[in-house]
Amino acid sequence: ILYDKDDKQFAKLGSEKREKVTYDQLPEVLVDAIIATEDSRFFQHNGFDAPRFFKAVLGQIAGNPDAGGASTLSMQVVKTSFTDAKVDSGMAGIIRKFEDIYLAVFKLEKVYTKEQIIEFYVNNHFLGGNIYGVEEASRAYFGKSVTELNLSEAAILAGMFKSPNAYKPTTNPQNAANRRTTVLYLMRKHGYITKEEEAIANAIPVESLTATSANLNVNPYQGYIDTVVNEVKDKYGVNPYTTPLLVYTNLDIN
């Protein structure tokens, strides 16, 4: 339960919306978009991509904002599905990163196929509000099943994995469009689509793709709620949608 600055309840977070899909149900354009954006060598490495890891680390040390992330898709699955969501920094963060590498290489990839790992990734990932997984996200943001997504919609959805609330198409269409441009560029770069397909998908207005707000049942303070949820996850490693909590905020509803 979330309370405002006057200790009045303004939101009650129920169980997250989640409907799982199998790898075979995922459209090829969505799988391609996720792989191109999140882990282009996913099907080649064993859970740890050394060149990418050290390139990202050196880039971050040098202060390069475009250095990219060091985590493979498998490492992200370990973090979101098999360990707590708390974000560590400093030495604790370094230790946590190597724990993720160990679990990804010697546990996850030894037991599950690449296709199963993708299933974990798309079904368990937070995608804004109280939505988890691509099926619920597709229905909420585009009004259709994930199996029906076109290239433009798939690129938008794949782009949300980096920062769901920042790139939510229903509330931040311009951010979503900018992120879609990046995803489509990466898809072309890695040979998944042609330049013509990239241009056509980029030309579609995001607003014309999204479901109407009437279908979304949006809390008027949803943006603030999303921020609070992320802060609680980062600081305490718990999910307010699944863990009973009383959260007191500074929200002034007036």
Regions of interest found by a model, annotated:
Residues 2-3, 248:
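Short, conserved beta-strand segments within well-ordered enzyme catalytic domains
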Residues 27, 110, 159-161, 165-254:
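Extended, non-catalytic substrate-recognition/exosite surfaces adjacent to catalytic cores, especially
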Residues 3-194:
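Peptidoglycan glycan-strand catalytic modules in the bacterial/periplasmic cell-wall system
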